[in-house]
Swiss-Prot record:
Protein name: Hemerythrin subunit 1
Keyword flag Iron: yes
Species, as recorded: Golfingia vulgaris (Marine worm)
Gene Ontology molecular functions: iron ion binding; oxygen carrier activity
Binding site for Fe cation 2: 59, 74, 78, 102, 107
Length: 114
């Protein structure tokens, strides 16, 4: 079972990881998915892909620097999301659900550890 999808689809404090840079990047991802859901076009998809790649890299660097034990599992989830974006089929509901559940399950595991 997943977490409720916010409507409107915006970041709220329930997604806070307490790492300012990560929270700011998560806000950008929410915005990117919101815009893609409103207008599924190549530009919006490209911008979401760019922001996602940057965020995942930044998060992974933080995890590696702190020798976070859940790094491999976390990176695998990131890789799967990127694969889905690279083979985009226009399912913005899938992207919305993935981000909400990823933050609240996978990302929350590193709170206070990286």
């Amino acid at each position: 079972m997943g977490f409720p999808i916010p409507d409107p689809y915006v970041w709220d404090p329930s997604f806070r990881t307490f790492y300012t840079a990560i929270d700011d990047e998560h806000k950008t991802l929410f915005d990117g998915i919101f815009h893609l859901a409103r207008d599924d076009n190549k530009d919006n998809l490209g911008e979401l892909r760019r922001c996602t790649g940057k965020h995942f890299l930044n998060e992974q660097v933080m995890m590696q620097a702190s020798q976070y034990a859940g790094y491999d599992e976390h990176k695998k989830a990131h890789d799967e999301f990127i694969h889905q974006l690279d083979h985009w089929k226009g399912d913005s509901n899938w992207a919305k659900t993935w981000l909400v559940n990823h933050i609240k399950t996978i990302d929350f595991k590193y709170k206070g550890k990286i």
